[in-house]
């Protein structure tokens, strides 16, 4: 009797499921954008109705990205996690679980924040762990950083780019100029040597290496797998490790990423 490789078949089933879910749901955001009151509609629909839709799952529904972020948090143990681009709060509860002290999330659209707060209440999250800030992330993040002790380790998840707004360059400049120990994960990033991952661009400007400031000192790490092994939106992710963070952890032990280049 031929032996069945259980791991292989479980992998095949998971790939099939991811493919079917992605095909069935990738058009939903486009359809919603054509509705004048799309977010009014979302408020009236129970969140459980969207369990198979990537944009209401943590980190765009990308399971390998979640594993990488969880592994980073386990090794790095950040006191504070800062998210820019709360949207409706689909990633915030997950990111809050990675912080030993406080989770701070920044959103520029009041409409999205209202929906996010409803989401947090529904989940029964305690308010003292999550601080919600309304405003331009490129402005508010500077205020937030000025109140955090320099010795605190911070994990950032930057996803505030939306429509024609791209505050990423300003966010990164503020973070790197502050210095200290930090790790930054950038969503929707163009992977320079792997075109299988999607990425975003705004007014002709792509989210790529060109937005990383010269003031950054550290290393850039990228996914060590193709988008075929990712779920959800399958967008690229960049991970920036500051020099101090590199001295505190062994990055080569982090799941799912590879060294791309040094920045100095």
Predicted region positions:
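A short alpha-helical cap/connector motif
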Residues: 2-155, 160-264
């Amino acid at each position: 009797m031929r032996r069945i490789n259980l791991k292989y078949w479980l992998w095949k089933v998971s790939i099939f499921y991811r493919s079917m879910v992605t095909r069935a749901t990738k058009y939903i955001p486009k359809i919603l954008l054509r509705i004048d009151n799309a977010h009014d509609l979302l408020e009236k629909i129970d969140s459980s109705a969207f369990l198979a839709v990537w944009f209401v799952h943590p980190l765009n529904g990308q399971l390998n990205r979640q594993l990488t972020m969880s592994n980073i948090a386990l090794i790095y143990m950040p006191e504070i996690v800062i998210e820019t681009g709360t949207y409706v709060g689909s990633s915030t509860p997950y990111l809050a679980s990675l912080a030993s002290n406080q989770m701070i999330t920044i959103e520029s659209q009041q409409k999205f924040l209202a929906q996010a707060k409803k989401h947090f209440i529904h989940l029964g999250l305690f308010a003292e762990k999550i601080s919600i800030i309304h405003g331009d992330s490129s402005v508010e993040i500077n205020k937030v950083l000025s109140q955090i002790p320099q010795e605190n380790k911070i994990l950032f998840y930057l996803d505030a780019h939306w429509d024609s707004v791209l505050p990423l360059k300003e966010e990164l400049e503020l973070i790197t100029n502050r210095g200290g120990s930090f790790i930054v994960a950038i969503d929707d990033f163009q992977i320079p040597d792997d075109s299988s991952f999607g990425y975003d661009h705004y007014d002709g400007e792509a989210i790529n290496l060109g937005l990383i400031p010269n003031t950054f000192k550290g290393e850039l790490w990228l996914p060590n797998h193709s988008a075929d092994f990712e779920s959800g939106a399958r967008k690229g992710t960049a991970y920036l490790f500051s020099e101090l963070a590199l001295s505190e952890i062994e990055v080569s032990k982090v799941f799912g990423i590879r060294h791309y280049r040094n920045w100095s």
